A protein has these predicted regions:
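Extreme N-terminal starter segment of soluble prokaryotic enzymes
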Residues: 14-16
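Short acidic/polar active-site loop segments enriched in Thr and Asp
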Residues: 113
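Acyl-donor-binding surface of acyltransferase catalytic domains
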Residues: 1-11
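Conserved active-site alpha-helix within GNAT-family acetyltransferase domains
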Residues: 97, 122-135
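Acetyl-CoA-dependent GNAT
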Residues: 9, 18-89, 100-102, 106, ...
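Glycine-rich phosphate-binding loop
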Residues: 94
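Conserved beta-strand-loop-alpha-helix junction that forms the acyl-donor binding cleft
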Residues: 88-91, 117-127
Length: 135
């Protein structure tokens, strides 16, 4: 992951790119279908897409498949994976792994020495991915 216009391949035709304001409605729909609580609002997502202290990564194959939101604390050189979601129909295609590669690469580009994340104990799939990635 080296530039704003990068594309990271997962499987098939899945690509990852930086999010844009026009992605916000689709991101909200994914957010609402993925989480029961602590959902981001449309206003919050639009803010994070534009904010210099966050990165939104979007996986797509012509349609939105998933996203990752990373916050950056440059003074402390720490990145925080705040949220990641993959559409139910896209799970098992490497979308989460591709989003994590973009998130980690983007954090490194910004000088982060560490990335932190939280995950529910009941989310075995995410825990397995994070463990494979060294978290």
């Amino acid at each position: 992951v080296t530039s704003d216009d990068m594309s990271t391949r997962a499987q098939d035709s899945v690509r990852v790119r930086r999010g844009a304001a026009q992605d916000a409605p689709a991101l909200i729909a994914l957010e609402q279908s993925s989480f029961d609580s602590d959902r981001l609002s449309l206003r919050q997502l639009k803010h994070h897409v534009r904010s210099p202290s966050s990165d939104v990564w979007v996986a797509h194959d012509g349609a939105l498949l998933g996203y990752a939101l990373v916050f950056h604390a440059s003074r402390h050189r720490i990145a925080r994976l705040y949220s990641i979601a993959v559409a139910a129909h896209a799970r098992g295609r490497g979308v989460g792994r591709a989003l994590m590669a973009a998130a980690i690469g983007g954090a490194r580009e910004r000088g982060a020495r560490e990335m932190r994340l939280e995950v529910r104990q009941s989310n075995a799939t995410a825990i397995a991915l994070y463990t494979q990635l060294g978290f």
